Design a protein with these regions (language model features):
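Acidic donor-binding segment of Leloir-type glycosyltransferases
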Residues: 1-19
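Acidic donor-diphosphate engagement hotspot in glycosyltransferases and nucleotidyltransferases
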Residues: 3, 30, 51-56, 81-82, ...
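Glycine-rich, basic loop-to-helix element that forms the pyrophosphate-binding segment
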Residues: 20-37
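Conserved nucleotide-sugar donor-binding catalytic segment
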Residues: 35, 73, 92-180
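Short aromatic/hydrophobic "clamp" motif used to bind/position activated sugar donors
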Residues: 42
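The conserved acidic donor/metal-binding loop of glycosyltransferases
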Residues: 46-50
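Conserved donor NDP-sugar-binding/catalytic core segment of glycosyltransferases
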Residues: 54-86
Length: 190
């Protein structure tokens, strides 16, 4: 993709671009990138998604609030096939400890999430054993202990297309989720 070229256009020392000479799994790459960061906040943007121009600024006043540990927003789903946008959630998103909400109806997209870096010290990094549900696993671990803050406005554009990795690998998704769920039962987290 054109990530390196796009990032170089910003001419801002705070924005860093990392390239690996070896192919890494998604979650191994994310863990390595997190370890290279020097800031206090971590945000993700998958290659086929994009943010509204106000994505970061809309929550900047909240970043220093000690009662808020991670921030997430609503999203639009952009359907590549027919070029239509649809708002993901029409109901207000919950704040605070949101584990029980997520256990019933998971609604967080990794590209719509900003995390205080110190959280990784307590919940750990992405689980490299997963190829699809690593985002879900991390968010569920965070949501048990830390306070989330929702922005109901859709500031993320999630692209839905025929080449979505999770769509093309549904069997892998279900196997990973089954493994995750069985582990939760063993740990008594059901």
């Amino acid at each position: 993709d054109n990530s390196k070229k796009i990032v170089s256009n910003f001419n801002d020392d705070r924005i860093k671009y990392f390239y690996s000479d070896t192919k890494l799994s998604l979650y191994d790459a994310r863990n390595k990138a997190i370890n290279e960061t020097s800031g206090e906040l971590i945000a993700f943007l998958d290659v086929d998604d994009w943010w509204d121009k106000n994505y970061i600024f809309s929550r900047a006043s909240l970043f220093n609030d000690d009662d808020k540990d991670f921030f997430y927003c609503n999203r639009f789903t952009f359907y590549e096939k027919n070029k239509k946008l649809k708002i993901f959630r029409k109901l207000d998103l919950p704040n605070g400890k949101i584990y029980n909400y997520l256990a019933k109806d998971y609604f967080i997209s990794i590209s719509g999430l900003i995390i205080k870096k110190k959280i990784f010290d307590q919940v750990g990094m992405f689980n490299k054993d997963f190829n699809i549900i690593g985002d879900f696993d991390l968010v569920m671990r965070m949501a048990k202990t830390f306070n989330g803050h929702a922005i109901n406005e859709p500031l993320l554009f999630y692209r839905d297309h025929k080449n979505n990795f999770s769509k093309k690998n549904l069997g892998m998704f279900f196997n990973e989720f089954d493994k995750w769920f069985n582990n939760q039962v063993k740990l008594g987290n059901n």
